[in-house]
């Protein structure tokens, strides 16, 4: 390794050291930093230098080949969170990658016990399941591959049998539980117990979303393109589709009591007989006001955010700007257009200008 590479690696290790110093080993969200692209390749740093708690480091040491999947799972979760909420008042803002030790990746929302916390934990757990399962199906790991329970049998009467490579989502879910879930009994404070129980439930809700959207794919076999026999296998849905399901769960999330007796129950007394389903997203505290800046909580507010003047949805100026109104300014765009290939051998284009109205919240 040359001198420049060694210097870069030492600087990266120093950044991770800052993260570990500010956030102790018990913190659940540290691993999420692995999804930030500018942090480099965690495999080169080694398990001991990564922002993981003691249990995760031990698992990392025993299964170092899973590091690329862990990093990809974090990246998937972060990307989908930002995509699903890009037009909302809370837009899943992450901390600056240039200052990795100044705050948790998702800031206040990671520990606030709100609906936003619920979505973060669910989508990150789902991302880990998705990436590990994909890696298994691709043959990148020795201890998992395709789902062996779906390699024989089928329905001869319906003319199909199991074949191909079914995604082994059960292994992905097992690893996600092993890597992310921590026993509640190790926590003493009542408030911490409630939040930890909530986070564990939402982790599982994220995993259930991946399992629920498993689909059946089939390929036909027969003479002259007929479908006399079909070979079928189960595959995971795109992570975007999983993100849409979790966003719907977020919109219909259930508020629970901040007191745990034998089990969690709904906050509203008249609804406590309604059972909590394992795929529900749960939250304890109401969300703060995301309309205005709150430096203490790290909430930037919506001032200066671009909005859609004609939309009635969350991205519309009326909702996104919280009734404060909006400013309009004209943006001039210059681009190449009407390009033609000239023989021989170059491309000639015109410069085209266009004007666009851009609306931003006051």
Curated annotation (Swiss-Prot):
Palmitoleoylation is required for efficient binding to frizzled receptors. Depalmitoleoylation leads to Wnt signaling pathway inhibition. Its main location: secreted. Glycans are attached at residues 140, 186, 308. One of its GO terms (molecular function) is frizzled binding. One of its GO terms (biological process) is canonical Wnt signaling pathway. Residues 1-29 form the signal peptide. A lipid is attached at residue 224 (O-palmitoleoyl serine). GO terms for cellular component: extracellular space. Disulfide bonds join 81-92, 136-144, 146-165, 218-232, 220-227, 291-322, 307-317, 321-361, 337-352, 339-349, 344-345. It comes from the Eukaryota. It is found in: Secreted, Extracellular space, Extracellular matrix. PANTHER family: PROTEIN WNT-16, WNT RELATED. This is Protein Wnt-16.
